[in-house]
Amino acid sequence: MKFSSLAAATALVAGSVVAADLDPIVIKVGVRSALIPGWPKGGSKFFYKSNGTEFFMKGIAYQQEFSTNGTSSDKNNYQDPLADVESCRRDIPLMQQLQTNTIRVYAIDPKKDHKQCMKLLQDAGIYVVADLSEPSTSIIRDDPKWDDVLYTRYTSVVDELAQYSNVIGFFAGNEVSNNSTNTDASAFVKAAVRDMKAYIKQKNYRSMGVGYATNDDAEIRKDMTAYFNCNKQEESIDFWGYNIYSWCGDSSYTESGYDKVVEEFKTFNVPVFFAEYGCNEVQPRKFTEVQALYGDKMTPVVSGGIVYMYFQEENDYGLVKIEGGKPKKLPDFNSLQKQISKIKPSGVQMDSYKPTNTALSTCPKSSTWKASVKLPPTPNKDLCSCMVKSLSCVAKPSVTGKELGKLFGTVCGSDKDACKGITADATSGTYGAYSMCSPSEKLSFAFNQYYQHQSAKGNGANACDFGGAATAQKSEKPSGSCANLVDQAGQDGTGSVTSAPGSGGNKPDQGAASTISAPSVNLGIVKLGAYIFCAVLAGAGMILI
């Protein structure tokens, strides 16, 4: 729904190829500690790595507004705040006036150069928490998927930001499931959490957390929290961001429900912080919640928060208005500055911290929670490429957009068995091995399955056409690592592929990604099941049966 930020600290004298490194922030995380190299054992707090002082986020969401909350968007013209050096030079001094030690950015372009802005942030003692998605490449709540395109986007952001010591971690999703009608989408986000954690470990990057930012929906809040922190450590979040706007004007600890937040998370085993906060129903905002957030009742449980947001936009949440390239402080800025200057959060030292909350949560089983504990498979480009090369009938490269959706409806409506290997059902936890491939690759698999089934009946002569959308190709018999991958997937694509991406058919190391099932099928328009249903009603039997 909105944006947020993370934490800051003291700079080390030690140099780096990019800039003088800030003291990394580490997480004391109980059951996770044994599996995350470099992270101390036990607990649910952020600490400065060198001196062990507890770290509380005093953050600001820093990005021009766009939607990253699980809704569809074709926009790709977002502004990367970490690549705009002049804006960084202009804005960071104002952030320092608010004692900012963390910013949250919602979308960066991994192809751009971020060295100068990250250097300016490091020099100012400011850390970064970055969302992995961008407006046109994110997990959509009403048509979720976890595929090659998303995997490539997410890993490219990790690759780009891993070089900076002032990056605390990443959000794999922001308010994707936001009510009881779309909880199944959380399975795809949790698969992204699992795979990014495994990727960071596989690349031998320094310790960086992968978390999720949730909205404050009373109906699904508890189930959501439990789901992202249950079953297996390697697929559970490393920190939990809470977008909360319940404290408006001169509210109170109890009236706002902050007391319930503390009660709910007092035994949680990973750090919790407000990923967005700052109700604007009363203006100018008074930010009196700052005293509660950093006071003695909340700091034992909540590790600070991120104010939404720096820039003044149409939504009227801004601290600063940019006019003619120059910043103008708004009344909200002055209110926040006044409140933040009063706080002195008291924490604990890492060495003396004795956590008792180390267990994972129990997975939700309520009637309103539809996401299975069985997650979509890890995207595997090698598997998809090997599969397409092995086919005799494939989709033409010219088939795109809405035509893809219609063709899925046609082939799956005519032969449901042809689509078993590409469908994904996050409620039942059933995923085809190729459900994480690109739409074109999935359509090629379905076309070929239909063609093979018709050929077995003696009807193959015209079965690879689909109105000119399909074409025959000379198939390649899989060999070597390709043979291993395709064999694991099975002839109909319903097998379980246990090879990690790029591993050439080898199983992942212990503690890396969990058994690969297969991410969801997103056709980009409507879910595949709906296409099948509509195609059957429309009489897709015009094709040979």
UniProtKB/Swiss-Prot annotation:
The lineage of its organism: Eukaryota, Fungi, Dikarya, Ascomycota, Pezizomycotina. This is 1,3-beta-glucanosyltransferase ARB_07487. Glycans are attached at N51, N69, N179. A lipid is attached at A512 (GPI-anchor amidated alanine). The GPI-anchor is attached to the protein in the endoplasmic reticulum and serves to target the protein to the cell surface. There, the glucosamine-inositol phospholipid moiety is cleaved off and the GPI-modified mannoprotein is covalently attached via its lipidless GPI glycan remnant to the 1,6-beta-glucan of the outer cell wall layer. One of its GO terms (cellular component) is side of membrane. It is an enzyme of class 2 (transferase). Its EC number is 2.4.1.-.
